[in-house]
Amino acid sequence: FLAPHAPQNQGMFNPIKITLPDNCWLNAKWPAPTIGCTTLTSAKITSAVWQALAQACPDKVTGSTNADCNWFVSSVVAPDGTTDVFSDLPAGGWGGTPFGDGMNVTEDPLGNCMNMPAESAELLFPIAYESFELRPDSGGPGRYRGGLGAVFKVRYLSDGLLSMESARTLQGSPGVNGGEFSDVQRQTKIYGDGTSEVIGGLDEAGGWKSPLLSNVPFTHGETFMFESTGGGGWGKPLDRDVEAVLDDVLDEYITFNTAYDVYGVVIDKEAKTIDLEATKVRRSELSAA
């Protein structure tokens, strides 16, 4: 990576020292739980290594992926009365790169998994997908934006219990080289009467609940909503091409407010065009802030 034309051998790793004190997060001892060791933990290690390398070679490193498998399993009662298990790994975005935006809604590179098609899940289990769509403003801002996460809504057509491992609920995916963090993830239970409750992550009042869910009950007609995060941005948002910002707004990847507040691009909402002079002024204001 740092010397791409040099032959790889053991000597290249001699300068690297890894320190893992006993009973730390990366060197857990019995009886500490380690179910997420190959998923949540390994993805965070990769993210941390990217952040470290970015200090030495920011032109080669990408923003962090969502760095989560977001694995959930749920029991469901089939029409014949038997119990089945529905499982999926809702994906998030990958980080912005030195040459382009990150990919939208793609499984973490360590997972070697694919998104389950909603149609396949509905054929196999008593559930209905109410939503599987891109989540606006979820990618980290940057010269090259982080890929977007998604909004997953799964309605139960029977009773069930849901367990899930997730993270990125207090801080999103970090960017590099001036790129910014993505939005955070959130798990929500929507009741049959339309009211909702955040069961993992931050609620509107700023309260937080652990995203490690265990046997959360759902009854027929209730919906589980998961909002996955995007990837971290690469480069400063004010360096992003203004036409790319406009395209993002028109594609509903970002909102008008984000275009103005973060990217400093002034867009006429009616004409869907850029006010270049006002944009120059706005970007100067944000640069001086």
Role assignments for model-derived ranges:
Residues F1-A289:
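Glycine/proline-enriched, intrinsically flexible loops and inter-domain linkers
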